[in-house]
């Protein structure tokens, strides 16, 4: 009883002490409330960003599952294709948990243009299957084309980052670009400085930025440079890229591909390394046996089912 009375007395004294100085107490309570709100908001924001990044990686880059020949993962050599492909495809077709899958060739190579070259990972894909599994086709920059929309040989899809590396992007100040900036709310006093550069083209972003820095103050560059770049950027669509890689016997081979589309996603590293060509074109150039597949990307109805599907596939 004495303990209960003491506890009640302490609580009573504490409550009175809180409101003895109302201003101080309100400041402390407000600080605690704001701190909690800021913490909850930050955690929610970070969780949302992580979820978006994971979703983007699954939908554009990795899918829910990938099936490979174990030796291909260890050595990355062309001859290590998936064994018993027909049986595996039959199994995937019968599993209700499997939403879609895409069979691919995959190999390392070099992409070359007259302006530059870069190492790339080349995927030979079936466009119809690829659309069912990944969303790259939804991320093609509008003015650059489509995702294998034309029924022609030797088309290639590349990322925006790789297009920059290969000098397939230029910047041109046109009347249309100036009008676009005006509509976007760029002040006339800023736009007037661009008048002397109308119809001038810059071969790369470095040259373009250098010229902009000569014309504008640091503050104007901070506020408007991204708008300048977006309004004046254009792509050398339909340009040719020469891909070189090893064929099935280890000899260097290659072919010239015409750009069918340029994709843009949140992962610039992926954009700079991964290119897509038609399965039949890559099979022909590398002299791989018909039906060869290095990986099968699988999209499930529910990612939680991945362990069960893996067990079923391995048991077969």
Where are the predicted features?
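N-terminal Sec/SRP start-transfer signal
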Residues: 2-40, 50, 59
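Hydrophobic alpha-helical segments typical of transmembrane helices
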Residues: 14, 28, 53, 87-88, ...
């Amino acid at each position: 009883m004495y303990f209960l009375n003491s506890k009640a007395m302490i609580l009573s004294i504490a409550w009175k002490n809180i409101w003895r100085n109302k201003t101080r107490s309100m400041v402390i309570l407000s600080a605690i409330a704001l701190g909690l709100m800021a913490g909850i908001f930050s955690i929610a924001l970070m969780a949302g960003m992580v979820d978006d990044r994971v979703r983007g990686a699954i939908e554009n880059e990795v899918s829910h599952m990938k099936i490979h020949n174990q030796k291909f993962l260890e050595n990355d050599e062309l001859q290590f294709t998936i064994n018993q492909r027909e049986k595996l495809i039959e199994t995937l077709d019968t599993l209700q948990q499997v939403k879609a899958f895409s069979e691919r060739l995959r190999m390392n190579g070099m992409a070359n243009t007259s302006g530059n070259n870069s190492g790339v990972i080349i995927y030979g894909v079936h466009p119809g299957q690829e659309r069912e599994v990944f969303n790259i086709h939804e991320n093609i920059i509008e003015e650059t084309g489509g995702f294998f929309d034309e029924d022609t040989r030797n088309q290639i899809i590349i990322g925006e980052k790789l297009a920059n590396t290969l000098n397939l992007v230029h910047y041109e100040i046109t009347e249309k670009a100036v009008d676009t900036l005006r509509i976007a709310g760029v002040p006339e006093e800023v736009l007037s400085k661009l008048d002397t550069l109308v119809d001038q083209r810059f071969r790369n972003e470095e040259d373009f930025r250098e010229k902009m820095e000569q014309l504008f103050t640091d503050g104007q560059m901070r506020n408007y440079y991204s708008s300048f770049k977006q309004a004046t950027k254009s792509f050398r669509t339909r340009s040719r890229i020469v891909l070189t890689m090893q064929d099935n016997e280890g000899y260097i081979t290659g072919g010239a591909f015409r750009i069918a589309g340029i994709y843009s996603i949140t992962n610039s590293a992926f954009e700079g390394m991964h290119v897509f060509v038609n399965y039949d074109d890559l099979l022909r150039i590398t002299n791989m046996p018909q039906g060869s597949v290095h990986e099968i990307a699988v999209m499930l109805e529910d990612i939680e089912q991945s362990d069960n599907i893996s067990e079923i596939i391995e048991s077969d």
